[in-house]
Amino acid sequence: MRLRKVKNALLKINQSPYFYSKDKFAKFTKKQLVLELGCGKGTFLIKEAQKNNNFLFIGIEREPTIVLKAINKINKLDFNLENILLLCTDAKQLDDYFQAESVQKIFINFPDPWPKKRHIQRRLTSPDFLKLFWNLLVKNGLIEFKTDNDKLFEYTLTTLQENSQIFEIIHQITDLNNSEFSFQNSITEYEQRFMELEIPIKKLVIKKII
């Protein structure tokens, strides 16, 4: 379904206290940093921020309209979240915003699988992105990756094997909701739909090494 863009969305999100700026980010220097790439409407991000007050959660989205939807969801909560920000940018620009070895964890939930060969480098688990994430993560930092797409999952496994000098797979799960890890799983909007359709969710937990 094509996204219906909101007029002046970028202006509106810039007026929100939840929208990323260097000044706002600087106030959280004592909190450990967690990123979610492709945070959508913010359902997963909100759940994680609720559970982990000692961390700063930053949701990343390219499209201002989607960032605005996430901000609106946060604004409608009946409680305050003081450890969450939204950033409107492309994932390949992350090193413009965050220093090397400053991120504790990166969540990649149901990214676009970019099935065509000519778009392989756009996949968030391509070698170039893995190297970017490795640079941003602290020592022993983690990536948590979830997908419903079998081909993307297999591609990611292959890419990680080819980059085993910088990352190792800690957990490999082929049916998350019927695994021992299901109880601690925060569910995204997409994930809820897949669960209703009984589509298995695949997950990898990946650790930075060296």
From Swiss-Prot:
- Which GO MF terms does the UniProt record name? tRNA (guanine(46)-N7)-methyltransferase activity
Q: Where is the active site?
A: 112
InterPro entries associated with the record: SAM-dependent_MTases_sf (IPR029063), tRNA_(Gua-N-7)_MeTrfase_Trmb (IPR003358), tRNA_methyltr_TrmB_bact (IPR055361)
- Which positions does UniProt annotate for S-adenosyl-L-methionine binding? 36, 61, 90, 112
Recorded hits in SUPFAM superfamilies, A to Z, give: S-adenosyl-L-methionine-dependent methyltransferases
Q: Pathway it belongs to?
A: tRNA modification; N(7)-methylguanine-tRNA biosynthesis
Check the record and name the Pfam families matching this protein: Methyltransf_4 (PF02390)
Keywords of the record, alphabetical order, are: Methyltransferase, S-adenosyl-L-methionine, Transferase, tRNA processing
GO CC entries: tRNA methyltransferase complex
Catalytic function, reaction form: guanosine(46) in tRNA + S-adenosyl-L-methionine = N(7)-methylguanosine(46) in tRNA + S-adenosyl-L-homocysteine
Show the disulfide pairing: none
Top-level lineage group: Bacteria
Q: What class of enzyme is it?
A: transferase
**Claim: S-adenosyl-L-methionine is one of the keywords in the record:** yes
**Catalytic activity, EC:** 2.1.1.33
Can you tell me which residues bind substrate? 116, 148, 188-191
Please describe what this protein does.
Catalyzes the formation of N(7)-methylguanine at position 46 (m7G46) in tRNA.
Return the PANTHER family for the record: 3-DEOXY-D-MANNO-OCTULOSONIC-ACID TRANSFERASE/TRNA GUANINE-N 7 - -METHYLTRANSFERASE, PENTACOTRIPEPTIDE-REPEAT REGION OF PRORP DOMAIN-CONTAINING PROTEIN
The name under which this protein is listed is: tRNA (guanine-N(7)-)-methyltransferase
- Gene name linked to the record: trmB
